[in-house]
């Protein structure tokens, strides 16, 4: 599993994006827009992964160098991330077929989080504002998220409580995944977070002085 995921996780995500694109082409007229939104985002996410990991790639290495923290079981981490991707995109697409709105909102929230993550990386890495994945986060994922939220709002589908449900649906499993990856590294989660925050703050100060 470790070796397989190290080698092929990118291609699995790419295949997921290709399947999503094929579904959109075949079902654009018949599928409701509510269901199309998370599927569109799957395509956007696959494009984003291409920039982060291959063209030009290097986002994982950048984060590792900024924080000074190395992931020992990278294949396991990639498997967990792939499972989370399916959970946060494919599952909402299926639930949207039953008319459920807040899971779709959870998918769209990823587009906002991705932008914030890359802006945070830019703040820490003073030597270069760009980080691999930033262009597609800003030009692809974020516009898809904004359009999706705009469409949901104009259709009167969003209720205030949906924001809470969407956030919980997305963030609780994400934090659990992070904790599991850290645990597989042989480190308590609070120590990992403290070390990462200190390393990022130190990198930011050093970059600022330069």
Q: Which positions does each model-derived feature cover?
A:
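Hydrophobic alpha-helical transmembrane segments in multi-pass integral membrane proteins
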Residues: 139-160
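Core segments of transmembrane alpha-helices
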Residues: 13-19, 77-94, 137-146
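Membrane-proximal helix-loop-helix units in multi-pass membrane proteins
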Residues: 87-140
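Small-residue-rich segments of transmembrane alpha-helices in multi-pass membrane proteins
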Residues: 19, 44, 131-146, 198-203
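Juxtamembrane helix-capping/reentrant segments at transmembrane boundaries
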Residues: 61-81
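Short, hydrophobic transmembrane alpha-helix segments
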Residues: 21-35
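The first (N-terminal) embedded transmembrane alpha-helix
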Residues: 5-24
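Short, highly charged, low-complexity non-transmembrane loops/tails of multi-pass membrane proteins
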Residues: 186-210
């Amino acid at each position: 599993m470790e070796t397989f995921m190290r080698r092929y996780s990118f291609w699995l995500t790419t295949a997921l994006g290709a399947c999503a694109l094929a579904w959109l082409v075949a079902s654009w007229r018949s599928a409701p827009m509510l269901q199309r939104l998370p599927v569109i985002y799957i395509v956007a996410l696959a494009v984003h992964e291409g920039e982060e990991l291959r063209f030009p790639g290097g986002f994982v290495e950048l984060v590792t160098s900024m924080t000074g923290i190395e992931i020992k079981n990278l294949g396991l981490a990639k498997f967990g991330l792939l499972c989370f991707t399916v959970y946060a995109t494919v599952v909402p697409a299926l639930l949207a077929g039953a008319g459920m709105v807040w899971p779709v909102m959870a998918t769209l929230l990823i587009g906002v989080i991705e932008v914030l993550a890359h802006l945070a990386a830019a703040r820490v890495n003073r030597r270069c504002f760009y980080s691999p994945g930033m262009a597609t986060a800003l030009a692809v994922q974020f516009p898809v998220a904004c359009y999706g939220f705009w469409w949901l709002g104009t259709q009167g589908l969003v209720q205030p409580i949906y924001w809470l449900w969407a956030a919980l649906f997305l963030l609780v499993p994400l934090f659990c995944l992070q904790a599991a990856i850290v645990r597989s590294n042989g480190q308590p989660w609070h120590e990992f977070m403290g070390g990462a925050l200190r390393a990022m703050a130190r990198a930011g100060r050093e970059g600022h002085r330069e």
